[in-house]
């Protein structure tokens, strides 16, 4: 009436259980390995993103002063170039001005260009190489003058942006290679004073 299990049947059941157990252990080990690998990748990605975000905040320029030259000191009507004295922001890594972009936004439209543009001139004031291909602000004490030649300025080259009239406003955004931006609002005086070659903006 009743089936009798002999030692052979019990042995087969034991082997089957062992195989299932080993399979479960292998699956768990593989899953753990995948989780560890994924966690490592996410941590690396998070660190890289964090460093990039830090660079975008800290590796930026400070604008120390802004001035402009008038078209004719005897009868001034327009600003035909803009001069910015630049430095690195506190805590910033070195900034290569040749890899920095400028964006002009105002009544004359919008223009974006690199500071290596032929209508931009970079002059060393302190701590910056005079070589055109090595305009790097390294120390916080370094200073460089960036001159933007506007349309109508004397000479062969300009950045393609119109000269500024009295009372005109202009927004200039400088963005470093790290992606950090500095915005400067420029306001041209409502009246020019005769015999002044430049004005503070």
Curated annotation (Swiss-Prot):
Identification of the protein by name: Flagellin B1
Kindly list the GO molecular function terms attached to this UniProt entry: structural molecule activity
Question: Which family is this protein grouped under?
Answer: Belongs to the archaeal flagellin family.
The primary site where this protein sits is: other
Described purpose of this protein according to its UniProt entry = Flagellin is the subunit protein which polymerizes to form the filaments of archaeal flagella.
- Which gene is transcribed and translated to give this protein? flaB1
Q: Does the keyword Kinase apply?
A: no
InterPro entries from the UniProt entry: Flagellin/pilin_N_arc (IPR013373), Flagellin_arc (IPR002774)
- Give the Pfam families listed for this entry: Arch_flagellin
Propiece residue ranges: 1-11
In terms of NCBIfam families, this protein maps to:
arch_flag_Nterm (TIGR02537)
Choose any GO biological process term that the UniProt entry carries and state it.
archaeal or bacterial-type flagellum-dependent cell motility
Compartments in which it is found: Archaeal flagellum
Q: Keyword Cell wall biogenesis/degradation: yes or no? A: no
Alphabetically ordered keywords of this record: Archaeal flagellum
Q: What PANTHER family would the database entry show?
A: FLAGELLIN B1
* One cellular component term from this protein's GO annotations in UniProt: archaeal-type flagellum
